[in-house]
Amino acid sequence: MATRRLTDAFLLLRNNSIQTRQLLAEQVSSHTTSSPLHSRSIAAELDELADDRMALVSGISLDPEAAIGVTKRSPPKWVDGVDEIQYDVGRIKQKMKELASLHDKHLNRPTLDDSSEEEHAIEITTQEVTQLFHRCQRAVQALPSRARRACSEQEERLLRNVVASLAQALQELSTSFRHAQSDYLKRMKNREERSQHFFDTPVPLMDDGDDATLYGQGFTDDQLVLVEQNTLMVEEREREIRQIVQSISDLNEIFRDLGAMIVEQGTVLDRIDYNVEQSCVKTEDGLKQLHKAEQYQKKNRKMLVIVILVAVIIVLLVALVAVKSR
């Protein structure tokens, strides 16, 4: 079943109404300081204008007779949660762009020395993105609990559509982030392989005497420093790879949870489609029954007319016989 996402339009209309009311309040306050009598009329006109605009936005008639039973209701509590989730989604997109630029800067650096500041920034940004994903996931799962207990069917349907839309958006973002992390991990491994190919030199075979002479001399200071630097580099690379793998595993958990939510929403939509189809079938059956009842009713009218005519004929015959007998 095709659905339309009306969340953005709803938020735009709500923000416009808030800005309009604030602007009208500022105008009323500025006119109040100038003249009290004139300010009352202006305030009344501005209130009427605001009511007209709100009526145009909401589609509610301002006719007193038509407005019977219409009450002003505050927006649902889960709308604030939707705003927070959309704000976090915007932050996730911004952080993902920053992380992509840090990855490119770290991997495409022309120098051969490693920058611990860049690696630390990559680690912090990755953790922030993962935390934002977890927060959005928990917020999306908590949206149905923030709905009113006695909410209408339209509000409940709107909430289900909003939850499905947010879950799908988060799933797409998590997939993109997971692909970016996997690509970064592959590029890291390729760089390590290229560095080993260019900098690892084969050791020539030596006799036992040369071997004893070499190890008898021991390592020089430069060789010890080089070995220590290589060890630190390998440990740093292993730590980065472990962090990337951990972030990917966390994203897999989020991906599974969001997939389960989307499956649940799809099941609800399928159930709604089934109910709509069943209602259409029952409506068609009811229409057929109405046609049959109409035909039966028409036949009953014909029989009633025939009975009345027969009764009239009998009465006339009796009257005719009575008249002739005299």
UniProtKB/Swiss-Prot annotation:
Segments in the Cytoplasmic topological domain: 1-302
PROSITE patterns (UniProt xref): SYNTAXIN (PS00914), T_SNARE (PS50192)
Statement: the UniProt record of this protein carries the keyword Phosphoprotein: yes
CDD domains, alphabetized: SNARE_syntaxin16
Function: SNARE involved in vesicular transport from the late endosomes to the trans-Golgi network.
Any single Gene Ontology cellular-component annotation: Golgi apparatus
Spans through the membrane: 303-323
Pfam family of the protein (one): SNARE
Domain annotation t-SNARE coiled-coil homology: ranges: 231-293
Domain of life: Eukaryota
Subunit structure comment from the entry: Interacts with GCC2. Interacts with BAIAP3; this interaction is increased in the presence of calcium.
Family: Belongs to the syntaxin family.
UniProt GO molecular function: SNAP receptor activity; syntaxin binding
Membrane topology of the entry: Single-pass type IV membrane protein
Vesicular side: 324-326
Entry-annotated residues carrying Phosphoserine: 41, 74
InterPro entries xrefs: SNARE, Syntaxin, Syntaxin/epimorphin_CS, T_SNARE_dom
Record's subcellular location: Golgi apparatus membrane
Alphabetical UniProt keywords: Coiled coil, Golgi apparatus, Membrane, Phosphoprotein, Protein transport, Transmembrane, Transmembrane helix, Transport
Species name: Mus musculus
Protein name listed in UniProt: Syntaxin-16
One GO biological process term: endocytic recycling
Encoding gene (name): Stx16
